[in-house]
Amino acid sequence: MKKIILITMLISALFAQSDCNKKNWQEYYNSDGRDMSDCQLQGAMLRGARLMGADLTGADLTGANFTQSRLMGADLIGANFTGANFTGAKLVGIISGDIRGVPDNLPEGWSLVDGTLIK
């Protein structure tokens, strides 16, 4: 019985450490499918990051800084943009919809209309 409890605790600890966040997001981006879905990136400093084709569905981007980042082809459906900064970010070919919150800044010519990014 003690072995089962110990194994359960170890497995739980491994899964708890594997949540995508602002400290380990690179591991998730570099994985198959660039899966950063539901990633917790609140306040993350991603200035100039190259996130082409990233799956950011449902990610919490609250207060994150994406200034001059490259998000071409990224999937942003259901992400939380509250207070995020996307000044100068490259958003060509993104997939968006059901975006929550209002970002502080978007790239020139872009707007958020009914949860969808439009240029």
Locate each region found by the language model:
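Tandem repeat scaffolds
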Residues: 17-119
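Sec-dependent N-terminal signal peptides
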Residues: 4-13
